[in-house]
Design a protein with these regions (language model features):
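WD40 beta-propeller repeat fold
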Residues: 1-153
């Protein structure tokens, strides 16, 4: 669940019992929740962030159970960016920038069950940085969390 910036709405992500992706938008209206939009996606959505999107646009970046990084237009529920970020499930995502030229380019960081950490610029198809476990490691550790921090314009 992520609050939509500067609104009384939030996105709810997840996976249904039929293993389809859940992407719902709810709005608070006089203390009650109203379902505004409901979309079913091909695969479960693990998590998302608005941090790499300007407030005026409010695109949400997500990682799913098949390792895809997808940026959605929340007003229409359509994909604006779609790339295979990880070989297995994406576990976490964070973002920074994209708020204007003084705050830098939009960037996303993802961590996955394949043990990789990748930094993405959504204006490009490939990651700008990819940290991967050694090829000769018998067991690849999961990457459970990622975050941008201490980065001020």
């Amino acid at each position: 669940m992520k609050w939509i910036p500067q609104s009384a709405r939030f996105c709810l992500f997840g996976q249904s019992p039929s293993a389809k992706g859940v992407f719902n938008i709810y709005q608070l209206n006089r203390g009650k929740l109203e379902l505004m939009s409901e979309w079913q996606k091909a695969f479960g959505i693990k998590c998302g962030t608005f941090k790499a999107s300007p407030v005026s646009i409010r695109d949400v970046a997500t990682v799913d159970y098949k390792g895809k990084l997808i940026i959605y237009d929340i007003e229409r529920g359509v994909e604006k960016y779609n790339v295979q970020a990880h070989a297995h499930m994406g576990n976490q995502i964070d973002g920074i920038g994209g708020k204007g030229s003084e705050f830098g380019a939009p960037e996303l960081v993802t961590g996955g069950a394949d043990g990789c950490v990748r930094v993405w610029d959504p204006r490009q198809e490939a990651p700008v940085v990819s940290l991967e476990p050694s090829e000769n490691e018998p067991i690849k550790p999961d990457c459970w969390t990622v975050a941008f921090g201490n980065a001020y314009n």
